[in-house]
Amino acid sequence: MIEAKNVWKIYGKGEAKTIALKNINLKIEEGEFVMIMGPSGCGKSTLLNILALLDTPTKGEVYYKGRRTSSMSENERAIFRRKISGFIFQQFHLIKTLTALENVELPMMLDERDKSYRRKRAKKLLEMVGLGDRLNHYPHQLSGGQQQRVAIARALANNPKIIFADEPTGNLDSKSGMAVMSILKGLNEKGITIIMVTHEQELTKYASKIIKLRDGEIVEIINK
């Protein structure tokens, strides 16, 4: 489904040059639950962003279903990000002036869905993540765990095939974190591919594949 071949990411030049990723080679199959792990600064988020087409490699290629993503137009890349992918971040990135329902509707507005469809689907998704009684709450009226569940519902708005999650439990207490992981596992069991960055070893029980990074290099790939 997604493949990286000889991917490098280099920032700066000369003495200021920083190598964030070194010769990354990996393959992610449809339906896998992949965890990218390693210490802070090892290149986890950089790799996730490149696989998600939020960033481009300095050298090497990323393929989606056999096609070089470097050959995609900017419009095709935008469609990949908007329709094929869903994104969940550590900081939630909810819009403070919108309700939970409106935050989930937003990707569908960008996709020009009609209002009745948006409202019905957003309500259904929030009910699915256990927030049917929080539809009209604003982010500041929700706990961290509830905000992350809104973010998951938003990520699902356009029926993505892949969810990219960057430390989705990083700002949550253990109970809320486990609730989020349970939701992600359930989505994976329905066929959605999950690619997730984490440094929490105890979460590896949810993964079908673990990619371990150190200093920008893959040091181990574990298929469970």
UniProtKB/Swiss-Prot annotation:
It comes from the Archaea. Residues 2-221 form the ABC transporter domain. GO terms for cellular component: plasma membrane. Pfam families: ABC_tran. The keyword Electron transport does not apply. GO terms for biological process: transmembrane transport. Gene3D superfamilies: P-loop containing nucleotide triphosphate hydrolases. GO terms for molecular function: ATP binding; ATP hydrolysis activity; transmembrane transporter activity. ATP binds at residues 38-45. InterPro entries: AAA+_ATPase, ABC_transporter-like_ATP-bd, ABC_transporter-like_CS, ABC_transpr_LolD-like, MacB-like_ATP-bd, P-loop_NTPase. Keywords: ATP-binding, Nucleotide-binding, Transport. Belongs to the ABC transporter superfamily. PANTHER family: ABC TRANSPORTER ABCH.1, IMPORT ATP-BINDING PROTEIN. This is Uncharacterized ABC transporter ATP-binding protein MJ1508. It comes from Methanocaldococcus jannaschii (strain ATCC 43067 / DSM 2661 / JAL-1 / JCM 10045 / NBRC 100440).
